């Protein structure tokens, strides 16, 4: 119980902090998060139970295989308060759920491909009496590892096959950040190695110079 209260206090403090200079600010216009590497046995209710700790979910989309209906291991969830996405990303990334380390990240834009004129399904929220709008994503053309799709200003719209080709990759920004971080790290390593080599060459020149002076003397 004490640990739960401590988490709640930390979450409240985090929400009260200004994050204009934080990387989270880049996603201040989107209340959606991407949740990846989910166990295939988890369903919408399981995900809501875990992520409702950080705010009130108002939309969830657990992507399923079109033919089998089985989970493909990733989902998109929208919070009522955009600031809840910051808490979810900071607190749930690399947290183990059923022996899997889940990946959680912001989603910059999200288009929802639907079959033409197909109504959205509704998933009950249990005892709350309200419901979540769940859009059906057409996954027939997407491999399991391909995370194409996602929202654009929280709209549910019908997309033609041509439109689906223009879907944004929800992991694009995350991948770019990781690449920049890796390149920066490699650049730092090369710089340190270069400094070390220069120091070594200087030391060898200095040693040779001393030996020459000793011989001359």
Curated annotation (Swiss-Prot):
Pfam families: RRM_1 (PF00076)
Biased composition (Polar residues): 128-138
Biased composition (Basic and acidic residues): 161-176, 185-198
Localization (cell): Nucleus
CDD domains associated with the record: RRM_ist3_like
Membrane-crossing residue ranges in chain numbering: none
GO biological process terms on file: mRNA cis splicing, via spliceosome; mRNA splicing, via spliceosome; U2-type prespliceosome assembly
Annotated region described as Disordered, given as residue ranges: 119-138, 154-217
Entry keyword set: mRNA processing, mRNA splicing, Nucleus, Phosphoprotein, RNA-binding, Spliceosome
Basic residues composition-biased segments: 199-217
Residues with PTM Phosphoserine: 160
Tagged with keyword Transferase: no
GO molecular function, one term: RNA binding
Annotated Gene Ontology cellular component terms: nucleus; precatalytic spliceosome; U2 snRNP
Domain RRM per the UniProt entry, residue ranges: 31-109
Role description: Required for pre-mRNA splicing and spliceosome assembly.
Oligomer status and interactors: Belongs to the 40S cdc5-associated complex (or cwf complex), a spliceosome sub-complex reminiscent of a late-stage spliceosome composed of the U2, U5 and U6 snRNAs and at least brr2, cdc5, cwf2/prp3, cwf3/syf1, cwf4/syf3, cwf5/ecm2, spp42/cwf6, cwf7/spf27, cwf8, cwf9, cwf10, cwf11, cwf12, prp45/cwf13, cwf14, cwf15, cwf16, cwf17, cwf18, cwf19, cwf20, cwf21, cwf22, cwf23, cwf24, cwf25, cwf26, cyp7/cwf27, cwf28, cwf29/ist3, lea1, msl1, prp5/cwf1, prp10, prp12/sap130, prp17, prp22, sap61, sap62, sap114, sap145, slu7, smb1, smd1, smd3, smf1, smg1 and syf2.
Family statement: Belongs to the IST3 family.
Protein name as catalogued: U2 snRNP component ist3
Organism: Schizosaccharomyces pombe (strain 972 / ATCC 24843) (Fission yeast)
Upper lineage: Eukaryota, Fungi, Dikarya, Ascomycota, Taphrinomycotina
């Amino acid at each position: 119980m004490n640990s739960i209260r401590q988490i709640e206090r930390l979450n409240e403090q985090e929400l009260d902090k200004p994050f204009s200079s934080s990387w989270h600010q880049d996603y201040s216009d989107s209340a959606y998060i991407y949740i990846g590497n989910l166990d295939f046995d988890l369903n919408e209710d399981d995900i809501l139970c875990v992520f409702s700790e950080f705010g009130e979910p108002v939309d969830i989309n657990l992507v399923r295989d079109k033919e089998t209906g089985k989970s493909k291991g990733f989902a998109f969830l929208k919070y009522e308060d955009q600031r809840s996405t910051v808490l979810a990303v900071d607190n749930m990334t690399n947290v183990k759920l059923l022996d899997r380390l889940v990946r959680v990240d912001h989603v910059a834009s999200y288009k929802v491909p639907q079959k033409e004129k197909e109504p959205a399904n509704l998933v009950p929220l249990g005892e709350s009496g309200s419901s979540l709008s769940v859009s059906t994503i057409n996954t027939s053309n997407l491999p399991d590892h391909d995370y194409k799709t996602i929202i654009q200003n929280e709209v549910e719209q019908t997309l033609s096959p041509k439109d689906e080709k223009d879907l944004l990759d929800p992991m694009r920004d995350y991948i770019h950040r990781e690449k920049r971080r890796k390149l920066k790290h490699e650049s730092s390593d090369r710089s340190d190695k270069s400094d070390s080599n220069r120091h070594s060459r200087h030391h060898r020149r200095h040693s040779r110079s001393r030996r020459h002076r000793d011989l001359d003397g």
